[in-house]
Amino acid sequence: MNIAIFVSGSGTNCENIIRHFADHSDVNIALVLSNRADAYALVRAKKYNVPTVVIPKAEFNQEDKLMPLMQQYRIDFIVLAGFLLMVPGFLIDAYDHRMLNIHPALLPKYGGKGMYGMHVHEAVKAAGEKETGMTVHWVSRVCDGGEIIAQFSTPLSPDDTPDDIAAKEHILEQQHFPKVIEEVISNL
């Protein structure tokens, strides 16, 4: 199975996924795609000899740009790992229940447009939540609205800053995200 990982940022999850599947006989990380040429995730992918492609935001919604690329790399499954663009409907339809996303909160709380990265952790802090977590979900046409596949939580203390909350949530991502992907793929 050929997987494409879509990224916009530093790529810690991307690298973790690449490492997890490095010796997997049935899964190949075939492509890392970013909307940003300066995304450090591209450097991480190249370190493992994974092909990388940049499709600027202005071209990302163009079916004639994106779909031939998916066909060229024979992409069977897509993982959004810190990808900050809305995925176009034609791609969601083409990869129905074969595209998942990670979100840095316990959805449905703190999801939707504008809820990413530190914005989420600041909102969790402002609300005085007693726990935070991560959600892996299918990608749908509703931002962060797809069916939930898995959630993992961790307790918070009143003294936790948004940075502390982010660090706790990031540990969950590193521990669980690749395993959830593997489990989902094994059940396809």
Model-derived segments and spans:
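One-carbon transfer enzymes
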Residues: M1-L188
